[in-house]
């Protein structure tokens, strides 16, 4: 304590001595000496003040950037760019849409106009322009509307270091007048620091990259794209003058919202160039009469191609950015992805083409009509029905109550349900809704009808992947991103029979082959019902409602998607073992240890399924899906490279035999994937295999297709599981999901640019594999009387071309196709057919 008192006493003594000395400079001196002393004192005091501001003396002035922590490594918010595998910029992630450019990438006219208008002594001062300061002060005193005193370097300091917001103004900054003085002082200090570190060319380039041009356009590159759809290098003299003119007031001189103001300001900038010798008088006279021609488009985060994929990439990189200290929206990364823009367009076109037809079928199926205006412009049956085909009460009301507009009505009329119902059910107003032809249309309708309108759209997802690399080449998350942002590629739905891949793969793992047989017969077993919390009897049936009773080769059972055989195999191989195999092949979703898993009762997502099917195409080697190949930071350094490793997760023999089974879906009689030939039949140099899947009540329709170098998958269904077709003729995977894959494959394999995807599966590379394991007679059912009610087997199918040359399936009545054989049944046989019923018995594996 005594030492502190001694220190203050010493300081006070020195201060008094300084005051005595300073007084001596004035006493008895001439007036001019006193004047010089006063001026010198002001200069010294000002320098000391600036030093105190810079070091934040006694926390009075707030933090300022230092040389090493800020000036030498300035941090600006830069947009991260995302590129496709074929080198196209497909989008950006940004808070401020800014992409930096180099000095040589900007037209010289822009820099000339900028200096001539904003800072004519830019190349002469050191960050602060004393002449400009005094001129601005004089104009302010005389109430003239002169130019500002800030130099380009000072404006750069303000833009880059945000001294008005990012750095506090300390304790003294709470006083309004002092706050302004502190802010300007910091701008001067930072400007001088910038001038000592960077060249004039670097400073003016940094300014061009950081300045705000309005309309969410930060930096010259984004501004040139936004207002004129061009690059900074290709800006004309007039366009450059327009952009420079906006810097005085981006709203008042905006060429889109205030074209007259912008035109006058542009001509002022051009005249400044004339007065400084950077533009001839004749050229000025030509340009000043030209109108401003805009090609205006504000770039948003969601603009560009492959919107669902880009959102998936953002999620894919979330943890990586957090761990590595990057911000996806401000760090200026260049992200190189696996997507191919040409394949992506083929995928989007295929999805839209097929889903438009699916929607027409759905509307006709439920008698849905969508009129153009007024109350009740949505008409039809209510398709939101439970498994017993009963309309779900208050289904639309429940959706409405979760919407912001309905919550706002409740808040506005808390005790007035009549008013809420009026605005919800009666009030007709313009609503923007989806339309296949126009993308988006505005209809006059009630809020209730708008929910019905949008809810009854069918949805889809599609993904294409290279099995050898895991590279995702196309990704369609739904029919339209602007109206449905929820990505169905990663949404979990029941896969139906496409899950049989894992049942049969585990069977191959345990030594079975495609030519081994299992019986197709009635099954009954006791299982635990999670909903009812009790044991119940489960009786899985085949798609056609009947059982042949025959022993069927596994290749035929898989191709025809016979449920009874899949359930028997599931019990024989063990559900736990099947789950383990599915996990190894790429399924990460939780799977229930229940007999129905063999028929795809647990939810998975499309990306997982494509990854798992890729494991088969890749001869048993698993590769995680790859969305990003590399990332380069704003300094040009590679900071991330995508995974390239793969792991052998199932034996090669099992993978080869599964390739044969999948091809059987197209080659075997009655194979559920045969209609794919209508799309890829011309590409005989490539082998294809496929598996369809349809869940209960046709809520989910799937198709997975494999080839040696490309795997694709599609899902089709309603936003809610209660929205679906009522018949397999319209709702099964081969009718809804398969054509999405078919149209895509037709386009890709018909494009010479993708010749690398053509090819056939490898010949057996394992001496343990013999032809008799997978080459055997196909199953041919014996003619006999049906013992159950028949639905889908009442028709046979053939593939024909419609009027536009597109492959479609045409049903042929079975009697017509079979001729006399079917029509020869006697009356007694018909009666016997009605009487016969399957005998219920517990499952028995002794005869497997």
Region spans (language model):
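Peptidoglycan glycan-strand catalytic modules in the bacterial/periplasmic cell-wall system
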Residues: 9, 76-285, 302, 308, ...
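Short active-site loop at a secondary-structure junction
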Residues: 99-104, 451-460, 483-502, 515-518, ...
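Short, well-structured active-site flanking segments
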Residues: 123-133, 218-220, 280-285, 508-532, ...
